[in-house]
Regions:
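Charge-dense, helix-prone N-terminal extensions
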Residues: 1-132
Length: 132
């Protein structure tokens, strides 16, 4: 049995995500939007949907990353984050599969390292789909 998180309803551009972004204005919304755009730009096979109330990026229908805004921070999360390389040690969390990077206006992040994590998660999911 596959342990991938699959969303057959994922589409190229989900208008609900645009509405979510408009509803999260300010610094935190800008942070979430910036990093979700990086996810969107990973490849032509990226699809998206609103899952559990937050923007989720998929390779075809297999979720690889998400953003979520809270009162004081934004999470950039990875569905198989526990299994991807994190040479800069950005990932937080202790779950079996998922990890996240916590961002805020006051808390700097190594943008190149986070971009690398997103690209790694995307490539990892592509490879998992090929292996199925």
């Amino acid at each position: 049995m596959s342990q991938l998180f699959r969303f057959p309803s994922a589409i190229r551009r989900d208008p609900r995500i645009e509405a979510w972004m408009r509803g999260h204005a300010g610094e935190l919304g800008a942070i979430a939007q910036r990093w979700f755009e990086v996810m969107r730009s990973c490849g032509d096979d990226v699809r998206e949907l609103l899952h559990d109330g937050h923007p989720t990026a998929c390779v075809a229908d297999a979720a690889f990353a998400y953003v979520n805004a809270f009162r004081a921070h934004v999470n950039v999360g990875f569905f198989r984050g526990a299994e991807i390389a994190d040479p800069e040690g950005l990932l937080e969390g202790t779950g079996r599969f998922m990890r996240h990077v916590k961002l805020s206006p006051e808390r700097g992040v190594d943008a190149a390292a986070l971009m690398n994590l997103i690209e790694t998660a995307y490539t990892d999911m592509k490879n998992r789909l090929k292996a199925e």
